[in-house]
């Protein structure tokens, strides 16, 4: 079956004739590699952001927006994905990007039943906080030690290494 898509469908969407079906969706795993991505041609900003959004929707990589400096961070499981993103942005969207290194250890989706501790955590760890493409809070630990200390200091915060929890 072919369906025209103007961007409303995502991988894993289900169509029915009225039945109420609920799937958990496809999980996103914590990436292994991280880099800042920057638009290399300000005259092509619209193409750059549209291409980046569509590539992330396809699941090529994961995009996080750092809450401290508002920079976009792409997370992947392999170096080749960065090259694929750059190639596709240039050849499919006529947009150029450049990569800048960022040292991160792990991306953890966080949640808590203790709203006060949750807000305190986000406030104290502001420089490590980001949002994923779905608007969920993500803690970007720059070392195993930082992650371990956060888990120890905030025992009511749950740290998840996949986005489905």
Locate each region found by the language model.
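Structural and coupling elements of P-loop NTPases
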Residues: 1-165
């Amino acid at each position: 079956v072919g369906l025209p898509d103007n961007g409303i469908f995502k991988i894993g969407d289900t169509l029915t004739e009225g039945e109420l079906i609920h799937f958990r969706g496809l999980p996103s795993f914590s990436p292994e590699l991280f880099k800042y991505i920057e638009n290399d041609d300000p005259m092509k900003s619209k193409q750059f952001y549209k291409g980046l959004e569509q590539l992330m929707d396809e699941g090529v990589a994961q995009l996080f927006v750092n809450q401290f400096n508002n920079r976009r961070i792409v997370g992947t499981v392999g170096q080749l994905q960065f090259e694929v993103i750059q190639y596709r942005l240039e050849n499919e969207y006529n947009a150029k990007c450049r990569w800048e290194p960022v040292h991160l250890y792990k991306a953890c989706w966080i949640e808590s039943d203790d709203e006060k501790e949750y807000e305190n955590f986000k406030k104290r760890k502001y420089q490590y906080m980001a949002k994923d493409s779905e608007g969920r809070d993500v803690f970007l630990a720059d070392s195993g030690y930082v992650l371990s200390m956060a888990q120890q200091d905030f025992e009511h915060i749950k740290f998840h290494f996949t986005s489905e929890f």
